[in-house]
UniProtKB/Swiss-Prot annotation:
Keywords: ATP-binding, Cytoplasm, Kinase, NAD, NADP, Nucleotide-binding, Transferase. The keyword Transferase applies. This is NAD kinase. Its cofactor is a divalent metal cation. One of its GO terms (molecular function) is ATP binding. NAD(+) binds at residues 79-80, 153-154, 181, 183, 194-199, 218, 252. It is found in: Cytoplasm. GO terms for biological process: NAD metabolic process; NADP biosynthetic process.
Length: 302
């Protein structure tokens, strides 16, 4: 649920994280650092960001240490950048502010051109806050966990690009749900419901909802439809056939799943706290990002 903060003491130490693989990211990041420092805040850069853009005037720390020293993290990039740092900060008391320097920007919802107007007030303690859930998943082979990871958006089991459909047996809370022949299956958080799950035909879940959504990817049976399940459910996806299937945890991948492998997915106890400008509204974000308020013109442009 989104809540408005009362006036509190300003955040003292601000961590900066950037989409350092993007062209021309150094100048806006350094501009942002100067703006924040000029208002009396201490600055620390995420280490990979600092190394890749050549930061020398500010200290740099790896994400785990950054979480211990910073009071808030400001992410300049797209949603993918925020997903990555969000996993590192999950469970820590460091909230995250997203400034868009990517494309769509559902979570990095502050346009860079507006940052000088809204960020000072947010760092001074005036913001809207919400808590987002994550997924915890393990890959189990012969009763041994061979891989585990957190996912902010989704856990996706995919067929190989060189083979046909993958066959999956899906159970929820120990109860068999179905066998499925498809290109894969998405297990999504409410946050991830506006990502891959949406493009695969899944519903949008408001972030305040306590639920998970299972979305088949191009299922062979048209009756295999998306389903929303309780947030505390445990989902087990067993690969029954299919060559070189893979599983993706947001942007982290494990390839070459074997028949018999089980992917166990449940809601993580860790959460991420996102901060937005005062007046933030989720429905306005959907309307803007998905162009709900626009209609095609005669030349088929929005």
């Amino acid at each position: 649920m989104t809540s408005r903060a009362n006036a509190t003491s300003p955040f003292k130490t601000v961590a900066l994280v950037g989409r350092y693989s993007a062209a021309n990211i150094a100048a806006p990041l350094l501009e942002l650092a100067s703006c924040i420092a000029a208002r009396g805040h201490d600055i620390v850069f995420e280490r990979e960001t600092a190394l890749n853009i050549g930061v020398q005037d500010y200290p740099a720390l790896p994400p785990d240490e950054m979480a211990r020293h910073a009071d808030v993290a400001v992410v300049l990039g797209g949603d993918g950048t925020l997903l990555g740092i969000g996993r590192h900060l999950a469970g820590a008391s460091v909230p995250v502010i997203g400034v868009n320097h990517g494309r769509l920007g559902f979570m990095t919802d502050i346009p860079f051109e507006d940052v000088h107007n809204v960020l000072p007030d947010m760092l001074a303690g005036q913001y809207e806050a919400e808590t987002r859930s994550l997924l915890q998943a393990q890959v189990v082979r012969d009763d041994e966990t061979i891989f585990s990871a957190l996912a902010f958006n989704d856990v996706v089991v995919n067929r190989s690009g060189f083979s046909g459909m993958v066959e999956l047996a899906v159970s929820v809370d120990g109860f068999f749900m179905y066998n499925q022949r498809s290109d894969g299956l998405i297990v999504s958080t409410p946050t991830g419901s506006t990502a891959y799950a949406l493009s695969a035909g899944g519903p949008i879940l408001h972030p305040a909802l306590s639920g998970l959504v299972l979305v088949p990817i191009a299922p062979h049976a048209l009756s295999n439809r998306p389903i929303v399940i309780p947030h505390d459910a445990e989902v087990v996806i067993q690969v029954t056939s299919g060559r070189d299937a893979s599983v993706n945890f947001d942007m982290q991948s494990l390839t070459s799943l074997l028949p018999g492998d089980r992917i166990v997915v449940r809601r993580s106890e860790r959460t991420v706290r996102l901060l937005h400008p005062v007046g933030y509204n989720y429905y306005a974000t959907l309307r803007k990002k998905l162009h709900w308020h626009e209609y095609p013109t005669e030349d088929n442009r929005l």
